[in-house]
Amino acid sequence: VTIQVRHVTDAEIVPKGFDPYDEAVFIFAELWPALNSDSTSTPQPVPPVRRGVFLLPNILTTGCLACGFFAIVSAIHGDFARAGQAIFAAMVFDGLDGRVARWTRTESVFGKEFDSLADMVSFGVAPALVAYQWGVAAIAEYGSGWGRFGWIASFFYAVCAALRLARFNARASTADKRYFEGLPSPSAAGLVAAFVWFSSEWLEPNLAGLALSFGVCAIAGVLMISAIPYQSIKQIDWNARVKFFYFVIVPLSLALVVANPPPMLLLLFTCYVSLAPLMWVWRKLRRSVGA
């Protein structure tokens, strides 16, 4: 075995432009805080988030739950206008609690679970009971078969809402944030609440109206557990440039809703609920024709 020994020059060891004095100053400056600190002292703890800030999102979630409970109580007493208003108020609280948690950096697993349970009451159980209670008093006049149909349709809506929330929680980490998989439960609740509110003030509880009410529950339930993508409002960049068209439509829609809430809310939620399935069918037809 032959071993070759080669003399290495200083230029090969020390890179070009290296200044030992500058490097020593740099290393000393980096080490000075550690050398100057007291080794026995403990690091200062990070100041905790104030309890009031941590509770704020959960207080909003509690407001959502309270509105759902109030909607159920109002429906039992026959006040369907207030029941519908309570469900829409629950939607406002539900839209605020998550945003407040992100703004204050107080998101937690407890908050997410609490929000899901509140959504089940306000957007799952409450709309189903409101729709059933609106028709249960009059539907008995048309025979017991219609009563069973109303009970099954309302229960089907509640079950679909539970499945929708469970699927959302299970796929929250991997889902596309731009879209919802299936109709969101607040939107489904808004459709049912708007229909009952509108029907209680504008329609008589005849057989056609009652059948349509429970049909709305069944359709909303099917759309909740479907895989049809719905646009997520949470991912809209409100700071980006928007067309002048939106500056006209949005204020006009709000003005019409304030002027006459029941029909306008029913129209808005019907458009949102039906637009995604229509677009989904349109894309399927285009693909089949192109193939």
Residue ranges and their predicted role:
Residues 56-61, 103-165, 196:
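Multi-pass membrane catalytic core of lipid/isoprenoid biosynthesis enzymes
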Residues 55-61, 116-123, 181-189, 242-246:
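Select subsegments of transmembrane alpha-helices in polytopic membrane proteins
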Residues 69-72, 89, 93, 127, ...:
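Alpha-helical transmembrane segments of polytopic integral membrane proteins
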Residues 70-85, 127-152, 195-212, 258-263:
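Helix-coil boundary and interhelical linker segments in multi-pass alpha-helical membrane proteins
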Residues 66, 92, 96, 100, ...:
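Active-site His/Glu-centered metal-binding helix of metallohydrolases
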Residues 44, 49-60, 67-80, 143-172, ...:
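"…together with the soluble PPM/PP2C metallo-phosphatase catalytic core" -> "…together
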Residues 2-95, 279:
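Topogenic membrane-insertion module of multi-pass membrane proteins
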Residues 3, 11-13, 17-45, 177-291:
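C-terminal membrane-associated helical module and adjoining short loops/tails
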